[in-house]
Structure formats: C-alpha cells, structure tokens
C-alpha cells in the first residue's frame, strides 16, 4: 500500500523544496512548517479553535495567543478576565455556565488542509512545566466521532496527583459512545530532570514513527511508547476497524487547567509553549 498525503492545493508550497531537511535513513520530507514568517500562523494551513472547547479546561481559545516570532511558533497562556459571551443563566453545560473568562490561550490544527497516513513526524519544541500547563502535540482522524476516529498524543505534559509527567498515548473506540480505549505511557518528569536539570529551559524533539505494523513515539531519541497495529481495533461504533489505517491531521495547543491540567499557578503567567518546526517524512512503499 502506498503512503497517502492529503493537501489542498493552496498549501502545496509548504512542501517545496522536498530535498531540504532530508534524513540519511531514506525518509523524504513531504510537509513542514518552519514558522519563519513573522505574525500569525499561516491561516491557509492552520485553523484556530475558539472558545471553551474540551476537557473542562480553564482557558478560552482565541487567535491572539498564537503567533510566529524569531522562527518560532509561540503559544501564550495568559490571565485575562472578561465576560463569557457563551454564558447562559441557569445553564448546567460547563461552557455556558461560566460567567467569565479568566485565562486565554490558543489551539491550532490542520483539519481540511493537511493529513497523512503512515510516516515520521517530528516536532522540536520547548514546553512550559508550571502548574496548570497542559501543552500537547497530537493527531486525530476524521469521518467518525471521537474516539473511534483515533487519537495519537505524541506529547502531553501535565501533573498526575501533583506529580509532573510527560505522556505518550493513543486512543480508539469501543462499543460505548465517547468512551475510549487508552494505551498510555506516563513518564515522570523527574526521569528527564535526572539526566539534565536544565531540561525545561531547552528545546527537545518529539518524534512519531507510524507504519502498518507499529506506532512508536520518541523523545530526544528515547522510545516512550510502542503500539502494535494488530492490537488496535475499534468497537461497533467504529465498525471494528483500526482507525490508524486512515489519515490523521495535526493539532498543537496549550491548554490550562481542566480535567488533567490541574491548578493553575497564576504567579507563573504568562506561560509560553514554543514550537521550532513541524516536519512530516515518508518512505516510498512504507
């Protein structure tokens, strides 16, 4: 089976020249964003999520908090208080029951502009590690509701019972709507600090290798999680198929608080999540 890349013609320039950044082991660069243009991320490539979106998170997503500067894509998590335009009196729905916005951040994705099936994805980034920070690099499928669409979390950082962790996960569906089967590896942040006490001040490379047999997630070359494709099957909602046999699109976001982020350390705000590049490679006949 040949690899699949799906792009709108308007973003084809993102892949030129393909020869740059080639890797010695036969991987060919097929898509990338180096974030070299000052200002907003390219809106022909990246779509913004807006408002309160998921996981009971505390931040309001808006466009102002993501921008390119000095060759980096910067997400800023800020303390900003203003009325919630979605507020409804007596509402029990979490998005509309909050009368105010207290924090803002950004979330962007390539849904409808770029998706890929199999390959290597690399992201070089520096993440915030303060209380309440929940940065992520992840992928989602389309065509069926979550989690049967499949989710790959190349990177998540948050605190579990107060202890900072870096996570590498995948999720798919079962027979119950909106209920996921998770394969999650949670590595205590101390594992990385023991090797480098200055880890949090530096950029690091997250990598996913994805083919017909395995999904492998790495951090600075260290294997964090390995999933066998043969072990992954949706339930009845996903027609018992493997969601990772279909293309996925890219998401980058900085969440704050919510179900997993924990208590936000207001004294540390604003916080920054910085992305140097996103690159996708493929091999012929992968």
Where are these regions (language model features)?
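GH16 jelly-roll
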Residues: 23-286
């Amino acid at each position: 089976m040949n690899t699949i890349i799906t792009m709108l013609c308007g973003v084809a320039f993102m892949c030129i020249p393909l020869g740059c950044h080639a890797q010695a082991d036969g991987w060919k660069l097929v898509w990338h964003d180096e974030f070299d243009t000052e200002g907003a991320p390219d809106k022909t490539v990246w779509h913004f999520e807006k408002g309160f979106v998921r996981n009971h998170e505390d931040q309001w997503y808006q466009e102002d908090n993501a921008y390119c500067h000095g060759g980096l894509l910067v997400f800023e998590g800020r303390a900003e208080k203003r009325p919630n335009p979605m507020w409804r009196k007596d509402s029990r729905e979490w998005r509309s029951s909050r009368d105010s916005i207290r924090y803002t951040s950004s979330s962007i994705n390539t849904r409808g502009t770029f998706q890929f099936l199999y390959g290597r994805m690399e992201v070089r980034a520096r993440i915030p590690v303060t209380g309440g920070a929940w940065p992520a690099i992840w992928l989602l499928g389309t065509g069926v509701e979550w989690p049967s669409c499949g989710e790959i979390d190349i990177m998540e950082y948050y605190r579990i019972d107060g202890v900072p962790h870096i996570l590498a996960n995948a999720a798919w569906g079962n027979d119950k709507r909106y209920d996921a089967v998770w394969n999650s590896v949670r590595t205590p942040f101390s594992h990385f600090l023991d090797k480098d006490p200055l880890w949090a001040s530096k950029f690091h490379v997250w990598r996913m290798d994805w083919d017909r047999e395995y999904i492998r997630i790495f951090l600075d070359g260290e294997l964090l999680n390995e999933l066998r494709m043969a072990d992954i099957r949706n339930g009845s909602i996903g027609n018992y198929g493997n969601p990772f046999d279909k293309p996925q699109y890219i998401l980058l976001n900085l969440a704050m608080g919510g179900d997993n982020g924990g208590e936000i350390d207001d004294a540390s705000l604003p916080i920054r999540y910085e992305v140097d590049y996103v690159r996708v490679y493929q091999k012929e006949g992968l």
